Amino acid sequence: MKKIAIYPGSFDPITNGHVDLIKRASKLFDEIIIGISQNSKKKAFLSINDRIDTINTALKDINNIRILSFDTLLVDFASLKNAQVILRGLRAISDFEYEYQLSGINKHLNPNIETLFMTPTEQYANISSSLIKEIIALGGDISVFVPASVKTLLKHRL
């Protein structure tokens, strides 16, 4: 059976931390599905198409990924795509409590899907899409935190 993992997130924008986790996870699974969540409660910074384009460009050297968007329960999306694992990144201990609760709920909703927590490479431990947006809003340089595809897109937009 093909080992498939879903790595969900808003990826608004994708960061070097996301890229690092995906590259490392791609060595553990036959396929990684990058699931871009469409959360109607959050105001998106980038469109879904822009996120797909920047992710595609940032990960062009990884052959075992697919990028899809979804607007359903994560476990339903994972089941639909025949994924056995949900990947979650833990940047800090403060992330753990929420992620642990979420994994328990997901396990209750679908006992066949496991959650795998991955910690970041140290240099990416403090990066988040929210912080990137704040740096952009204040006119700061984000080039060390995001792939070139994100920097290029934002340079032409802002």
Curated annotation (Swiss-Prot):
<dbReference type="InterPro" id="IPR014729">
    <property type="entry name" value="Rossmann-like_a/b/a_fold"/>
</dbReference>
<dbReference type="InterPro" id="IPR004821">
    <property type="entry name" value="Cyt_trans-like"/>
</dbReference>
<feature type="binding site">
    <location>
        <begin position="10"/>
        <end position="11"/>
    </location>
    <ligand>
        <name>ATP</name>
    </ligand>
</feature>
<dbReference type="GO" id="GO:0015937">
    <property type="term" value="P:coenzyme A biosynthetic process"/>
</dbReference>
<keyword id="KW-0963">Cytoplasm</keyword>
<dbReference type="GO" id="GO:0004595">
    <property type="term" value="F:pantetheine-phosphate adenylyltransferase activity"/>
</dbReference>
<dbReference type="InterPro" id="IPR001980">
    <property type="entry name" value="PPAT"/>
</dbReference>
<comment type="similarity">
    <text>Belongs to the bacterial CoaD family.</text>
</comment>
<keyword id="KW-0547">Nucleotide-binding</keyword>
<dbReference type="GO" id="GO:0005737">
    <property type="term" value="C:cytoplasm"/>
</dbReference>
<comment type="subunit">
    <text>Homohexamer.</text>
</comment>
<feature type="binding site">
    <location>
        <position position="18"/>
    </location>
    <ligand>
        <name>ATP</name>
    </ligand>
</feature>
<feature type="binding site">
    <location>
        <position position="42"/>
    </location>
    <ligand>
        <name>substrate</name>
    </ligand>
</feature>
<feature type="binding site">
    <location>
        <position position="99"/>
    </location>
    <ligand>
        <name>ATP</name>
    </ligand>
</feature>
<keyword id="KW-0548">Nucleotidyltransferase</keyword>
<feature type="binding site">
    <location>
        <position position="74"/>
    </location>
    <ligand>
        <name>substrate</name>
    </ligand>
</feature>
<keyword id="KW-0460">Magnesium</keyword>
<comment type="function">
    <text>Reversibly transfers an adenylyl group from ATP to 4'-phosphopantetheine, yielding dephospho-CoA (dPCoA) and pyrophosphate.</text>
</comment>
<feature type="binding site">
    <location>
        <begin position="124"/>
        <end position="130"/>
    </location>
    <ligand>
        <name>ATP</name>
    </ligand>
</feature>
<comment type="pathway">
    <text>Cofactor biosynthesis; coenzyme A biosynthesis; CoA from (R)-pantothenate: step 4/5.</text>
</comment>
<feature type="binding site">
    <location>
        <position position="10"/>
    </location>
    <ligand>
        <name>substrate</name>
    </ligand>
</feature>
<dbReference type="GO" id="GO:0005524">
    <property type="term" value="F:ATP binding"/>
</dbReference>
<keyword id="KW-0173">Coenzyme A biosynthesis</keyword>
<feature type="site" description="Transition state stabilizer">
    <location>
        <position position="18"/>
    </location>
</feature>
<feature type="binding site">
    <location>
        <begin position="89"/>
        <end position="91"/>
    </location>
    <ligand>
        <name>ATP</name>
    </ligand>
</feature>
<dbReference type="Pfam" id="PF01467">
    <property type="entry name" value="CTP_transf_like"/>
</dbReference>
<feature type="binding site">
    <location>
        <position position="88"/>
    </location>
    <ligand>
        <name>substrate</name>
    </ligand>
</feature>
<keyword id="KW-0067">ATP-binding</keyword>
<protein>
    <recommendedName>
        <fullName>Phosphopantetheine adenylyltransferase</fullName>
        <ecNumber>2.7.7.3</ecNumber>
    </recommendedName>
</protein>
<keyword id="KW-0808">Transferase</keyword>
